[in-house]
Amino acid sequence: MRSLVGPVPEPAERASSALRRCARATLSLPAPTAGTRGTTDGSRENTAGSRGNATPAVALAHRTSGTADLSLVIPTADAAAIPAGGVHARLEVLDEILGGAARGWCRRLVVVDGLVEQIDTRAQRHAATRIARDLPDSALLGVGSESALVRLRTERILLTDDSGVTDIAPDDLATSGPDPFTDLEGHWLDHLNDPRCQVVPRRALRVCRCLPAERPLLIGIDRAGVDLELTDREGRARRERLPFAEACTDVAELGTQLRLLAGGARYPQDRAALRP
């Protein structure tokens, strides 16, 4: 277990985690103008001018290893509207909580500006297979038919959360991976926020002398600590950060730190309690 440098992960890591979860995202594309456009098979077709911008939903975002470039899954019709040579676009990702009673709450916003490009159909299928090894997702099953993979060459990243607005350099995103517990966080929030589980109320006593009127909510778990939402008797809500004594790298270490925050022993007698 390595020492904890700060109470929260770095901005680039928080942004990387939000992109991997991709709870709710849209891609803002400029409307096509009259002329021709490229298609995923390399041919060209005539287009009619239209007004307004297209904002297709993004079903998945995957960062290419070692770079800040992103592969995005969007509807085929919207991908076909991207001209040859690409077009500047904006990806907006709402990092919504995916588990527990706070499901659907937005905790941060990630905005990525860059050049979005088409990928030919054959390369899309190969890329989808490669992505599935790292990020299995049902959104990849439709690639090549009702959905398409496009590439976003990242130029600028903005992260907005409780810490304020942070401008993240593409190189920082390229060298930062998501939190190691990103994929499982939603399941743990479901379990730990269960009314039958008393772990969250015990943690809440570390930041308030008595329990608030409403049951405290665990709204975030990462390698560096947990986030709680507390509501007082007047209905005012506030968020509290409880950092771990040491950063976690695997599930066993995370279970240890969660128990210590709740006032438990480092090594429980019940082996089942080793799990978060």
Language-model segments: which ranges?
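Binding-site signature for planar aromatic cofactors or substrates
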Residues: 1-276
